[in-house]
Design a protein with these regions (language model features):
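A periodicity- and composition-biased signal for non-globular, repetitive helical segments
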Residues: 11-12, 38, 108
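Serine-esterase "nucleophile elbow" of acetyl-processing enzymes
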Residues: 21-98
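Bacterial Sec-dependent N-terminal signal peptides
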Residues: 1-24
Length: 135
């Protein structure tokens, strides 16, 4: 009976661990605005891309954004690397006339670990290059 309980506990732990490993993690938070992006009237005027500061602008005065054709795409805690990989879905595909990028705060805070200032700047430059290439 002791061996059976140990074996059963081992199987339960293994199943729990395998289910955690099998879960997909949306590191860049692609899903955050996926449904809202489908409802945007194209082309949009301005997309505000950023972190919690940008998200706060939208949350504090969403009527101002809506009345002016502005779209808020800030996500709390985001780093420039995360913003860069979701830039196509949350900015380019919305065909804005302009984009405002507020980025770098969470990189400096090392939310995803250390990143050099050169790489932070490189991510921001890449976003601006993508915006220019698709304008």
């Amino acid at each position: 009976m002791k061996n059976f309980k140990k074996w059963l506990m081992l199987v339960v732990c293994a199943l729990a661990a395998s289910s955690l490993l099998g879960q997909e993690k949306d590191w860049a938070n692609f899903g955050r605005y996926a449904e809202l992006n489908k409802t945007v009237e194209l082309p949009s005027k301005v997309v505000f891309m950023g972190n919690s500061i940008t998200e706060g602008w939208w949350n504090n005065d969403s009527l101002f954004f809506k009345n002016n054709g502005f779209i808020g795409r800030g996500i709390s805690g985001q780093t420039t690397a995360q913003m860069l990989v979701r830039f196509r879905a949350d900015v380019i595909n919305l065909k804005p006339k302009a984009v405002v990028i507020q980025a770098g705060t969470n990189d400096i805070a090392q939310n995803n670990g250390y990143i050099s200032q050169e790489n932070i700047l490189g991510n921001i430059i890449s976003m601006t290059e993508l915006a220019k290439a698709n304008h």
